[in-house]
């Protein structure tokens, strides 16, 4: 296929640039038509930047990838979908807001667009979605990270080592908005934000983000584990997250939200 895939991006940070690098190395030509940022004059890197969603959509992207956080997703996603453009959100945790999720699904259905949920930092998301049709009774996500990966994004003290949080996926997204997007993906693929259990652990000796997914039900059970290296010291995201966003933008390896 020689026609370039036209991709827009919300955000222009470490994650966005890492994903753009993966897209640039694909066999199919990909054109990054622009990044939506608050101040184009301060944007770093070689990607073209725009200061409004109208300017970005004027570049006729076929798909837009959000890499700018939950607030940006809430602000721009509905307009993107209403324009008939598919959306790949990195900030899946924002979809714990039932009203927002409903509004985005309504906009997508009306315009014939899709919300492509990436697999993020975890393997086994497709298996969890398949198991849901058979019957899933319990889902647990357990994340183990170095203190800096969690402390910079929350207010209040955290333990030096051990269990920092235990609760539902909905509670985890509220507590760790920068770190709990994977829990959103797991909740949407499986049994929802309230029934999905989450444990966040701190390990000062950790050199990677360790993600574990455990599920049990009428299908049987499984345990998946990923030890993901971070993109950089300044980013909490694992390198594989950028790859999953690129894969979803290219049209495969994603969960279609419905």
From Swiss-Prot:
Q: Which UniProt keywords apply?
A: NAD, NADP, Oxidoreductase, Pyridine nucleotide biosynthesis
Catalysed reactions, semicolon-separated? L-aspartate + NADP(+) + H2O = oxaloacetate + NH4(+) + NADPH + H(+); L-aspartate + NAD(+) + H2O = oxaloacetate + NH4(+) + NADH + H(+)
Task of the protein: Specifically catalyzes the NAD or NADP-dependent dehydrogenation of L-aspartate to iminoaspartate.
Q: Which domain of life is it from?
A: Bacteria
What's the protein here called? Answer: L-aspartate dehydrogenase 1
Taxonomically, what lineage is the organism? Bacteria, Pseudomonadati, Pseudomonadota, Betaproteobacteria, Burkholderiales
Keyword presence, NADP = yes
Q: Which gene encodes it?
A: nadX1
Q: What GO biological process term is on the record, naming one?
A: NAD biosynthetic process
The family this protein is said to belong to? Belongs to the L-aspartate dehydrogenase family.
Residues annotated as binding NAD(+): 121, 181
Kindly give the HAMAP family that the UniProt entry links to this protein: NadX
Which residue positions are annotated as catalytic?
211
**One Pfam family this chain carries?**
NAD_binding_3
- SUPFAM superfamilies in the cross-refs: Glyceraldehyde-3-phosphate dehydrogenase-like, C-terminal domain, NAD(P)-binding Rossmann-fold domains
Additional note from the record: The iminoaspartate product is unstable in aqueous solution and can decompose to oxaloacetate and ammonia.
Q: Which organism is it from?
A: Bordetella parapertussis (strain 12822 / ATCC BAA-587 / NCTC 13253)
**What are this entry's molecular-function GO terms?**
aspartate dehydrogenase activity; NAD binding; NADP binding; oxidoreductase activity, acting on the CH-NH2 group of donors, NAD or NADP as acceptor
Q: What is its EC number?
A: 1.4.1.21
Q: Where are the transmembrane segments?
A: none
Fetch the NCBIfam families from UniProt.
PRK13303.1-3, PRK13303.1-4
